Amino acid sequence: MLAVGPAMDRDYPQHEPPPAGSLLYSPPPLQSAMLHCPYWNTFSLPPYPAFSSDSRPFMSSASFLGSQPCPDTSYAPVATASSLPPKTCDFAQDSSYFEDFSNISIFSSSVDSLSDIVDTPDFLPADSLNQVSTIWDDNPAPSTHDKLFQLSRPFAGFEDFLPSHSTPLLVSYQEQSVQSQPEEEDEAEEEEAEELGHTETYADYVPSKSKIGKQHPDRVVETSTLSSVPPPDITYTLALPSDSGALSALQLEAITYACQQHEVLLPSGQRAGFLIGDGAGVGKGRTVAGVILENHLRGRKKALWFSVSNDLKYDAERDLRDIEATGIAVHALSKIKYGDTTTSEGVLFATYSALIGESQAGGQHRTRLRQILDWCGEAFEGVIVFDECHKAKNAGSTKMGKAVLDLQNKLPLARVVYASATGASEPRNMIYMSRLGIWGEGTPFRNFEEFLHAIEKRGVGAMEIVAMDMKVSGMYIARQLSFSGVTFRIEEIPLAPAFECVYNRAALLWAEALNVFQQAADWIGLESRKSLWGQFWSAHQRFFKYLCIAAKVRRLVELAREELARDKCVVIGLQSTGEARTREVLGENDGHLNCFVSAAEGVFLSLIQKHFPSTKRKRDRGAGSKRKRRPRGRGAKAPRLACETAGVIRISDDSSTESDPGLDSDFNSSPESLVDDDVVIVDAVGLPSDDRGPLCLLQRDPHGPGVLERVERLKQDLLDKVRRLGRELPVNTLDELIDQLGGPQRVAEMTGRKGRVVSRPDGTVAFESRAEQGLSIDHVNLREKQRFMSGEKLVAIISEASSSGVSLQADRRVQNQRRRVHMTLELPWSADRAIQQFGRTHRSNQVSAPEYVFLISELAGERRFASIVAKRLESLGALTHGDRRATESRDLSKYNFENKYGTRALHCVLTTILSQTENKVPVPQGYPGGVPTFFRDMKQGLLSVGIGGRESRNGCLDVEKDCSITKFLNRILGLEVHKQNALFQYFSDTFDHLIEMDKREGKYDMGILDLAPGIEEIYEESQQVFLAPGHPQDGQVVFYKISVDRGLKWEDAFAKSLALTGPYDGFYLSYKVRGNKPSCLLAEQNRGQFFTVYKPNIGRQSQLEALDSLRRKFHRVTAEEAKEPWESGYALSLTHCSHSAWNRHCRLAQEGKDCLQGLRLRHHYMLCGALLRVWGRIAAVMADVSSSSYLQIVRLKTKDRKKQVGIKIPEGCVRRVLQELRLMDADVKRRQAPALGCPAPPAPRPLALPCGPGEVLDLTYSPPAEAFPPPPHFSFPAPLSLDAGPGVVPLGTPDAQADPAALAHQGCDINFKEVLEDMLRSLHAGPPSEGALGEGAGAGGAAGGGPERQSVIQFSPPFPGAQAPL
């Protein structure tokens, strides 16, 4: 693809004039008339040259490649222009896509041919629309000057940080010099409407196939993606009473599908499991209790229930009691001695940590896992519940996770239920869900690693398909409470000047500490420094994290008091408590305190006191470890002389598995890989040493006189400086909050700490235990919760210790029914924790929905924590709710940097700063000292926080290979405020630039989009059904041709005009008369000087129109004057393109080609059904045709209310995709033919079977196999009503699995050999499972899988009066 780089005028690019006489050539003729159109797909490489000459159209440069948004406006979201821009530069646009430049995928294209391609267009601001030169202009401008980037600026508030939905999009621009055609001069106004966009994230949820139970007490929703696919038909009948009201219709539906899935055996021989992904507050506890009760009624009296805390045992008992299952006892494993298995029946309740418990008592090695297995027995078929199952994530890397897998493998027939609102936040965390049957024998993925690779390679779209496929297959259900009534807001908190001064001093002191630690390590000759630097950077991160939190305390207290004054109550979310430092100070002062403790100061002091390099530390390390041998081929380390004459900062991880647990028990961070031998030679201020001072020239002998004294003096000097700084550092956030909001008497604390510091009435400060008389510390949180719910206390502070399973909503059953205001002071570093905290105050049966307030400071370091949450939320929503935008609605997605774009942006930034390479992204505007100062300061700053590499021959620093986003964002916490904000801004500008590039090239994954949002006239023109391979049953995919009528009738336009009130709103007619008629439109003012335009042929134009452009080309008229041209244009555009309407002829039509310019009707192609099974095939075809394997997932709702979700197939790929599907279908049918052994004769003929008494029935007879068309049960009764899942669901309907007699009446030979083999398999499968033959077990009902069995023909008594065999 051609691309013209911008010419540069100092720091700003300018466009060069187009070559004189350049002409635009039409595309070569194609075979199918459908593929012809006057549009170009601008986002992918053509399969063959699109031009027949060397002359090329000139493309302007992009004007939005930086991260800064256009001025904030509030344009209503409209559909975007994915489709291919017309040759006249009429580029459809959409203001709703400033964050999501969706449609730039080739799979977001319209029906236009992929062969009609020109270079990627570039963009200019929307307010320049009236200046756009087109091929129809008489005098196109010779050149256009446009900035390559909108310059960045320092922090200016949250909304300015990333693009806003309410900002008008930039429009595509293309400057051409061709022979003018005056009669079509104004064709540029004909904006093509976009076919793809985002609509509502949620849809109201009502059980579609389960009709039992009473309505849920609150409104429940499902993501619109999951709501687009149906669940399987119900074949299981519950033994539970359905009319008692103890379980709602939603909960009974989940119980039904779980028990139905438990009737299925996977190809591995294990029983299939079920995932309950319901959000917090829907009632997962009662649902799980219902599954246990159902199995109890079926005779399975034992069950295992795993959760995160022993306290939740009381919630389990409450749930069983609420559903009237009082006869089921709950036994706490923690109260049972090792080796005791005397408990006979009931629920064994245990925590995940108990799974790895061991005991050596009595000289015998006992484990809890062995105890559980002994209690269950080898043939255990009861229920195993993994409640809050996200705690078992990382099963491949943690002992606890491996125990969860081991338990499932050793009890293969157990009925497993996974239950969690968060499920798995990343595909790799699904490893413990081995019973879902998504990977393994007989599935598209042989093992979990193959599944993981496929999903991560294909991005969020594949994750969304997984969720839909799981629901269709009957193994997954995910509903959540409606968020209607819930308000979200982000409170951006500016830093006080005094606080900023303290922060800057702390940053400088940490940079000095880095140098001091390095000097001390060099002086004593410390070799192994991995643990040292792990401790250093872990403490570094904690210290600045505490400062970030402390910056928000004052504002939070103000907000809390305001909300209390409005008769509301406040819930404050924290993650860490800082208790460890408090206990250290107590120990140092013999249990006495005279002031509040600073957690930040404690972290710094503890690091120096415990981990400062010393000879003792060297001896300890040397005695227990050996130096690793350098791998062959590695370069030599920095010379000893260099290391001795300057500080050597080794690039190391930010945390370590050996990190000090005493620093903060509530904090976690991920270990990073260590490159021991990467060194940066720095001087005392963190810069590369060129002029080394006298101190550095001293030869240091670790065993010589004075070395130990100098090291000790360095340590004491550093301690003194930290203590001086500590006088100004903020005190422990949790203690200060409780003190400011009224003390323990008015604040309910639900955290994991055992003591706190409080103010006494006389003004003194004292430490007190949280334990109360008659209560153990374990029960204090429950008592505090009761006080809050009763209204005794109106402020609650919760941490992770209380964020699972605790209900703090405005419940109708409690006294305190004030509206909850949930303030997140400290964003959890994990989305798992975030979702749990958000769900504490938004639950069923509440009087009012909560308000959420997220407090975020302007520190770049604070955004680091927000970015992690945003990443987890985005991925989480995609995987567990089928739609990543479900969690994006929590307003945190603006901070998502931890992805491939973040990695690329980071590499680009580091190479630019350290290696002095060129970067097209400008530095933040307004940085003191300008560009040279910016790069000098950033280089010094990066080195002062340990980010850098080896010095190359040209004097530049090589970029560290393994510097991750996490490390980068952790480390820049330690820069002065203005530096970290500038560096963070530069990073985010580069990040957005890379995303924009991918959007324009069609490589950006937008998730699931809506086809023709806001348009109701959508119809299915045709469908073709194909079989897809699977095990034990084959699936189906359906290829649809969709028609979209985007026109706007006069009646609808007139009704809309009646609601308009703006001074310039209303109908307009063009000054230019075309085809003896003026063009007509309806304009609606948005905000400022921009209007949304509606036209009779295309409906809402996604490009916003500027007021001056509107008034220059149109004049306002009354509705009566507009009616006739509107109706005429609407009728004519059904069959005639714009050229025919304007000029009474069309050049393309005269050449025998199809022209779609301005037509009302559009065609699209979709592939729906068992998409996971054909994903790889379709991606390969796409890559072959279009050089990109990205698949765009779309959804739509037709005129007759049918919903479809599937892969959008571009017009240019249709022929190849259909060819591949036909080959696949033929392969499946060939494989099925000998298995069925059931040839279809040309005419029905009776089958004479000996059936009298004493007659012998030859069950070994097998008629010869013949090719035959698929029997009726292979038809596709309803689109997407698929029961096809990976290895668990039959292809046909139950009616299709007829008995031999029924087949005989159909005139079809029976393969009795197959029937006999099926009988033998049933015999070898053993006796029916307990209760399986009871009501609702389904046909067959045996352990072999009931109605889901693999055999094509199920054996039943074939003759009247005959006895069932065996």
UniProtKB/Swiss-Prot annotation:
Gene3D superfamilies: P-loop containing nucleotide triphosphate hydrolases (3.40.50.300)
One example GO MF annotation: histone binding
Keyword Transcription regulation: yes
Record bears the keyword Transcription: yes
Record-level GO BP terms: bone mineralization; bone trabecula morphogenesis; cellular response to interleukin-11; cellular response to interleukin-6; cellular response to leukemia inhibitory factor; cellular response to lipopolysaccharide; macrophage activation involved in immune response; negative regulation of DNA-templated transcription
Domain of life the protein comes from: Eukaryota
Region (Disordered) residue spans: 1-24, 174-217, 614-640, 1324-1366
Compositionally biased tracts (Gly residues): 1333-1347
Keywords: Activator, Differentiation, Osteogenesis, Repressor, Transcription, Transcription regulation
Residue stretches of biased makeup (Pro residues): 15-24
Ranges annotated as biased composition (Basic residues): 614-637
Pfam family, one: AAA_34
Cellular component, GO, one term: nucleus
Induction pattern: Up-regulated by interleukin IL6 and soluble interleukin receptor IL6R in astrocytes.
Organ and tissue specificity: Detected in macrophages. IL10 regulates expression in a STAT3-dependent way.
InterPro entries recorded: P-loop_NTPase (IPR027417), SBNO_Helicase_C_dom (IPR026937), SNO (IPR026741), SNO_AAA (IPR039187)
Subunit details: Interacts with TAL1; this interaction inhibits TAL1 occupancy of the DCSTAMP promoter, leading to the activation of the DCSTAMP promoter by the transcription factor MITF.
Recorded family membership: Belongs to the SBNO family.
Function recorded in the entry: Acts as a transcriptional coregulator, that can have both coactivator and corepressor functions. Inhibits the DCSTAMP-repressive activity of TAL1, hence enhancing the access of the transcription factor MITF to the DC-STAMP promoter in osteoclast. Plays a role in bone homeostasis; required as a positive regulator in TNFSF11//RANKL-mediated osteoclast fusion via a DCSTAMP-dependent pathway. May also be required in the regulation of osteoblast differentiation. Involved in the transcriptional corepression of NF-kappaB in macrophages. Plays a role as a regulator in the pro-inflammatory cascade.
Protein name, entry field: Protein strawberry notch homolog 2
Naturally occurring in which organism (per UniProt): Homo sapiens (Human)
Gene it is expressed from: SBNO2
